[in-house]
Amino acid sequence: KLDSSRRTLLERINAMGIDAREDEVFSSAYATAAYLKDVLRFPTDRKAYVVGMNGLEDELDANGIQHIGGTDEQDCQGLDGLDFSPLASKDALDPSVAAVVCGIDTKFSYRKLAKAFRYITRPGAEGEVRAGEQNGGCHFVCTNEDVTFPSSEGLFPGAGAVWKGIQVSSGRDPIVVGKPHQPMIDTIFVRFAFDKSRTLMVGDRLDTDIAFGQRGGIDTLLVLTGISTLEHVHASDAAAVPTYVVNGLCDLNTALS
């Protein structure tokens, strides 16, 4: 949910007593970096402007994609009142940037919003991204569309809440890589040749997790410990209907034993 790197997620999984390898872990941050590199063929001499955190930056690094913004201290700071001069100066934007990549960002600032806006609305931004050029085309790619995520302290805004401000102000729709969208499905299916009939997608959201499994042609299991409830499942306008529903993962363990 927090666009963690595969390494960070692997540490959490291993700490739960589950034996797994890094190449078996797929996060929206990893899928986004892989999509930029392998599908969009992002030029190695261009940069991504990041609205996001360490996990997203780590995966961009692992895929050889240069980036700025993100955890940079200056970009995490707001402006001084209505003084827009720091964003309007000649050197405010890097002409080598050819993608705005957005995920969850707990240090999201007006400076980041404005820079992302200016990159994807500059002249020619919706055109082709080319190597060896300055300015021109600029992709708008987001990790996932979760507008909220559950934590031990309650419900908080997610990545979708961050990038929608950029979308609304710029008028540009992003490429959303994570669940339930096709880029994530393609990344997993290309990496592993597995039997869909023996696969189960487990998640806590109808609109992302369960819809993702259905689009991928696999059975789904909704866990009622997160966002979606039985009321959501039975609603006439349900985003998706799961194959199975359990109160918690302990119920799944009982069923499999």
Regions found by a protein language model. Give the residues of each.
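Asp-based, Mg2+/Mn2+-dependent phosphohydrolase catalytic module
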Residues: 2-23, 33-257
